[in-house]
Amino acid sequence: MIRNQYYGTGRRKSASARVFLRFGNGDIVINNLSLDKYFPKDNFQIIIKKPLEVTNVLNILDAYITVIGGGVSGQAGAISHGITRALLQYNAEFKSVLRATGLMTRDSRMVERKKVGLRKARRSPQFSKR
C-alpha cells in the first residue's frame, strides 16, 4: 500500500525536528520558509540534502519540516536525522545505504555541564602565582 506521507523525528543536541515526506518535485520547506532562506549557508544545506542524495530521491519527494530548539548546526543535524528516519518508512531497503554513510546513528554528544568552582565545563579560573 502506497501512503501519501511519511514521518520521521530527528534530534541533535537540543534541537528536535519533525519531518514529513510527500511525493513532489524536491521542495524542502522548513518552518514555512524555503531551504535557501532558512539556511543561507551551503554547508548546512549539504547536510540536510545528504540523505535524499544518497538514496536518489532528491527530485521525487518534498520535505515539510518543523524544527525547534538549538542552534543552526544542531537543527541541521536534527533535520538530517529526521529525513533519514522518514526515508526508512518510505523504503526499508534504504537502511543498508543510510547505515553505511553514518546517517542512521543518532549523535548522542551533548553539552557538558558547568561544574562548581570552574568558569565553564572544564575551564578553571585564572591562576595567579602571587
From Swiss-Prot:
UniProt-recorded Gene Ontology molecular function terms: RNA binding; structural constituent of ribosome
PANTHER family in the cross-refs: RIBOSOMAL PROTEIN S9, SMALL RIBOSOMAL SUBUNIT PROTEIN US9M
Protein name as it appears in the record: Small ribosomal subunit protein uS9
PROSITE patterns found in the cross-reference section: RIBOSOMAL_S9
A Pfam match: Ribosomal_S9
InterPro entries (UniProt xref): Ribosomal_Su5_D2-typ_SF, Ribosomal_uS9, Ribosomal_uS9_bac/plastid, Ribosomal_uS9_CS, Ribsml_uS5_D2-typ_fold_subgr
GO biological process, one term: translation
Organism: Blochmanniella floridana
Homology family: Belongs to the universal ribosomal protein uS9 family.
